[in-house]
Swiss-Prot record:
Name the record gives this protein: Protein C19orf12
The organism of origin for this protein: Homo sapiens
Record's keyword annotation contains Transferase: no
Similarity comment text for this entry: Belongs to the C19orf12 family.
Pfam (any one): C19orf12
GO cellular component, one term: mitochondrion
Membrane topology per record: Single-pass membrane protein
Disorder cited: Neurodegeneration with brain iron accumulation 4: A neurodegenerative disorder associated with iron accumulation in the brain, primarily in the basal ganglia. NBIA4 results in speech difficulty, extrapyramidal signs, oromandibular and generalized dystonia, and parkinsonism. Most patients have progressive involvement of the corticospinal tract, with spasticity, hyperreflexia, and extensor plantar responses. Spastic paraplegia 43, autosomal recessive: A form of spastic paraplegia, a neurodegenerative disorder characterized by a slow, gradual, progressive weakness and spasticity of the lower limbs. Rate of progression and the severity of symptoms are quite variable. Initial symptoms may include difficulty with balance, weakness and stiffness in the legs, muscle spasms, and dragging the toes when walking. In some forms of the disorder, bladder symptoms (such as incontinence) may appear, or the weakness and stiffness may spread to other parts of the body.
Mutagenesis / variant outcome for changing residue 85 to P: In NBIA4; no effect on its subcellular localization; no cytosolic redistribution seen in response to oxidative stress
GO biological-process terms attached to the record: apoptotic process; autophagy; mitochondrial calcium ion homeostasis; response to oxidative stress
UniProt KW keywords: Cytoplasm, Disease variant, Endoplasmic reticulum, Hereditary spastic paraplegia, Membrane, Mitochondrion, Neurodegeneration, Transmembrane, Transmembrane helix
Induction: Up-regulated during adipocyte differentiation in an in vitro preadipocyte differentiation model.
Length: 141
């Protein structure tokens, strides 16, 4: 049996798509910088009250700048460079090594029939996205 990277990538896309997983690289540094800068300017212009107003306005602006930057995990997976897809493939292949399949459709059906395999693959995927990509996971309901 030839194990294909593409089959496993399609499987991981199906799993993460079914769970409506999204990920965003954290931009908290950007938000903190904007908040701090606005508080500083507010303090220079208006003294202590200006500091409070500048901090509040900066916090809102920073939150607005960093919101809505989540992308679907399947999209992120398909945009990964081949070397990263190979890393994911190696980790997933270790989990599903006992399965035999001929194509991505059959592989997906086999995994979807096993809650244990789904959980193992999802845990591996969440670990990869949070640690390697330094992204935050969000689930849409």
């Amino acid at each position: 049996m030839t194990i294909m990277v593409e089959d496993i990538m399609k499987l991981l896309c199906s799993l993460s798509g079914e769970r409506k997983m999204k990920a965003a690289v954290k931009h908290s540094g950007k938000g903190a910088l904007v908040t701090g800068a606005m508080a500083f300017v507010g303090g220079l212009v208006g003294g202590p009250p200006g500091l409070a107003v500048g901090g509040a306005v900066g916090g809102l602006l920073g939150a607005w700048m960093t919101s809505g930057q989540f992308k679907p995990v399947p999209q992120i997976l398909m945009e990964l460079p081949p070397a990263e897809q190979q890393r994911l493939f190696n980790e997933a292949a270790a989990i599903i090594r006992h399965l035999e399949w001929t194509d991505a459709v059959q592989l997906t059906a086999l995994v979807m029939g096993s809650e244990a395999l789904q959980q193992q693959l999802l845990a591996m995927l969440v670990n990869y996205v949070t640690k390697e990509l330094r992204a935050e996971i969000q689930y849409d309901d």
